[in-house]
Amino acid sequence: MTFRRTWQNKSTHLKITLGAFVLSALSTTSLADPIDKSAIQFIGPLAEDMQLKPYQTDHRDAIIANLLPSLQTSSDSIHLFGNDVDWQAFDKVSALTLGGLQALKFTASTDRFSQGTLTLKGIENAQLFIDGEKQTEKNQAYELALSQGDHQIVIITEQVANWNQVELDFTAKSELDTLQFSAKQQHGLSAKQLFDAPTINFVSMAPNGDYFITSKRHYEDATANQAQYVTELKDAKNNTLYRFESAQPSSITWSPDSKRLVYLLNGELKRLNLKTMQLSVIAKNLSGANGFQFYDSNSLIFSWSKSPEDNGKLTKHYQGLQDRWSYARTTSQVYLLDIATGLSKIVSQGPLSHSLEDFDAKRGSILMSRSAQAMQLSPEPATELVELNLATSALNVLGQFKTFNQAKYTNEGIYVTAGPDFNNGLGRNLPQSMLANNYDGQLYLLSRDGKKATALSKEFNPAIGQLNVLENGDALIKVTEQDTVQLYQYDLSKKRFNKVNAGFDVVEQFSYSKERNPSILLTGTTASTPQQLKQLSLGKSRAKILWDSKPIAYKDTAIASLEEFNFTNKDGVEIKGRVYLPHNVDKSKKYPALVYYYGGTSPVTRGFTGRYPFNLWAEHGYVVYVVQPTGATGFGQEFSAKHVNAWGEYTANDIIDGTKAFLNQYHFVDSKRVGNLGASYGGFMTMLLATKTDMFSASIAHAGISNITSYWGQGWWGYLYSNEASKNSYPWNNPTLYSQHSPVFHADKVTTPLLLLHGDSDTNVPVGESHNMYTALKLLGKDVELIEYKGADHQIFARDKRFDWWDTMLAYFDKNLKEQPQWWQYLYAEK
């Protein structure tokens, strides 16, 4: 309950006795009185017999930092030096002074970016933390700058003479800065949770299913951009047998009998005996080696790359389009390594790089691929699939293909994944007049000699990605199915696909045993549920949860609600979409909205988090509409083929019409406060939409393409992507496509405020693409901003940059869609 009374003093300086309170500076004539102190949590004394306080030692910061995590949890007590110490309401504290340490904890909430100064009185020595981050103190005062949401404040006190005289002074920077303080446990989703939460980034299961390995990654304030890893070996009952903490092993592989584990760590190849837990070194000096697998019980097969040394010349002579890549002259070959002696021998031949696809130790054959493009210095990509006979060293070329992704042996031949145009269009399921989109992965069966190929997935709409082969010869494949990522088993004997029901919207990592009835270990999320690790037996419907990040990182966290929203476009095609609603949405009010899309050749999948945090945007008060426009894979070949030579032709209409349908359905969204954003091809779409419609009130393009020709010619992979997106079209034979579909050629039509974001080291879509549009719009006197991230490539990965990037996008939309420019001004104050 909030009480208000008239306040005569015109100052916005507010004095609050410590307790649960509401502070408001909405006007200089009203103030919310302090509410009951019982809403503030207090704990103490902590280590009452402490002879010296932390500030009296040489290790104050370390002592306090180590205590903090225990105070941040929602537990009712902490266990300290053998005793339980309970949290209690602050109004129950009657002692004037206490030994040891004490702590106060409460939540600061705001429905907009707010600033002010918090001053501690009556506390002589303390450290204050907001969301786990230590704040800088100046004359017992702390400057607050809080984004919309809930923020945990913890004050660890070391010296208080009289608790009855403790006060907090809060000075709001302006009448618009509003904060509410309480002791509530539930809180809204935060950026730190999404980025820092522990996630499993690697899983591997032993062939017999008795052991498995997981590697978890998390971030924290103390280590900033440096991820923290813990890799664990576990038994079938989920008991930890061995733990790697100091460094993360790679190239983990199991012996065929599941008795030994081999991995690469710090350039050394090591072997762990799972019975004795004895560790031995097999080989050293393996820089550039990766992908180790047991070829048989005595040897390992792997790839070993070598980069050329700098020739010291002042010039660089390009011998082909690939020379724009920093790794163009790096070669990789396939090797065998003898475990007993550590001796390695090369098995692939010639100057070209060879990629290991698969091997069959019983037949003594190795399946590899190599780039025919590199062989011929041709701009047209092509891949040769070759088979090496180890006994005779004979190399058999099985075929040369313009589209190729992966190959694996099976009982009846070789599985191949590639686009619809594989083997002269064998996988096409399209009208003759349409060009296929070869990013739409298909499954094929190739005979052992490469002379006969069969298309297996022409009637299967999901796009096929990662390929694995089970012991019985069936394929286990990860696919993009509409806006989800799923696992399927391809039953080779029955020629059909069977879905593996794991209960995830997005399957991430997976591994499987080599038993007759294989066990599968997999991680994944749903749009509204954070990562879990599950185990299931193939063919059985029930999955067992082995690990769940929700109680670890998202306890007491309110998550946005999700609704499906689809519409039928002008061509009669259903366009999928989904809508995220703020968890406390009040449909009697009007809300701003954000429309997100990619628009390129893949859909925006339903992962819980990612580079574009839809759940976080909803927590900041936006209704978020994610639309899957025409051209994406996962919806069938005809749908994805419309990406070819379109460059926004269908996509723009779907986004515009989808937004109109969304606004018609969601009456509580304010149509005058709708923003839109996308990245890469989605950034191109943002710029293009700005030239076609004024329905959006603010737009953001990250790493967008403004001039198709310059992207094609200068982006590292621009010409390769254009082999599909602009198939058979070039600036000289189709200048209309390259110019009239390029947003910069229509910059004079832009009326919407536009924020351009870009990494200044982007090699995929060079930063000049944003500069083109920025220059044009500035000369035209348009409302445009350009923000570059120093040292960042196409995506923003580093923790500090990611938080800043997320803040920048939200601050820009707050300025333009909520009429709240303060956050943007705080981030980008004019000097």
PLM features: residue spans?
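Cap/lid segment of the alpha/beta-hydrolase catalytic domain
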Residues: 549-672, 679, 713-718
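Short loop/turn segments that connect beta-strands within beta-propeller blades
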Residues: 234-237, 273-277, 338-342, 389-393, ...
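Blade-terminus and WD-like Trp-Asp/Gly-His loop motifs, strongest in beta-propeller folds
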Residues: 203-211, 251-260, 264, 291-299, ...
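A flexible loop/linker signature enriched in serine peptidases of the S9 family
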Residues: 197, 216-230, 244-249, 263-270, ...
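Active-site-proximal cap/loop segments of hydrolase catalytic domains
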Residues: 629-831
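Non-catalytic accessory segments flanking enzyme active sites
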Residues: 193, 200-204, 211-216, 303-304, ...
